Amino acid sequence: MDLKTGECRQLTQAHELDTASLSLLPDDRGFILFDGPALRQGNLSTLRDREVYSIPEGWTRGPGASMTGDGVSSLFFEVSPQASRLRLLGMAKGSATTVVEIPFPGSHPIARPRRAQVLYRQGDEALWLVNFDGRQNRKLKTASDGTIGTAFWAPNGRTVLYLHIPTDVTKLVAIREHTPDENSDKQVATTSQFASLGCNGDASVFVGASRNRNSPHILILLRVARRELMLCEHRCSDPFAVSPIFSPDSQRIYFQSDRDGKRAIYMVRVDKFVEETEA
């Protein structure tokens, strides 16, 4: 989509697109996605794509995929009835190696910025961290008495930011921060029942979509003040699909909603409230 004109163009003919696997390359010139069992790499200029890898027989694809920061490799899970394995795929030659094999379905691997480590999920139960060489595979000690919502690396790669959803429905959903190198976990702020979470370029401001049916809002939360500011209503039938994100310079927020009858992308300017960050 051209953000100035709103004009869209089709990038792929994928028949079994896994939207959770769609990821831009670090140079912004291409993208990867899973089309059924096939991992494909596309070029944004030529609109051509090629198959890089296919999931072998006896395995199925786990949810999610991502690129390493240097754009050399991609990360994804292959799942069998007995186990799952985290795969590191060299994009140039299409050769895959197994980072680690685990006895549960792994998903949504994310490379750690500036470090040879991978964050991945065990459903909504737990977050795990492992080195690229398969060593030090460990479960992170996140908050208890609840499940894990959105989780991602802070832009500097030092901490993991995530939503903690308490088992007790009378308690508020909270943004928490885990520091793997110190094995510490702390609450950043409670929220107006965020369904999903994003942050700006330096993680000083968060954006979320409320799951509260009576207050279906897009909000930003200032980290230092721990204060929320309402931006607009998303009125989406599925608040978990809203997925608000900041632009690279932190001056705009984009989100999706079906509030006008069909799924569309919306933009809100926040330059009056949020300082510009390096794009």
Where are the predicted features?
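Multi-bladed beta-propeller domains
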Residues: 2-18, 41-61, 89-107, 129-149, ...
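Hydrophobic beta-strand positions that form the internal "hydrophobic ladder"
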Residues: 30-31, 74-75, 118, 159-161, ...
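Blade-level signature of beta-propeller repeat domains, shared across WD40, Kelch, NHL, RCC1
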Residues: 241-279
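Residue-level marker for isolated small/hydroxyl-bearing positions within beta-strands
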Residues: 34, 77, 121, 163, ...
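Loop/turn-rich, solvent-exposed surfaces of beta-rich toroidal or solenoidal domains
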Residues: 167-173, 187-225
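Conserved loop/turn motif of beta-propeller repeat scaffolds
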Residues: 28, 70-71, 114-115, 157, ...
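Structural motif
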Residues: 37-42, 82-88, 124-129, 168-176, ...
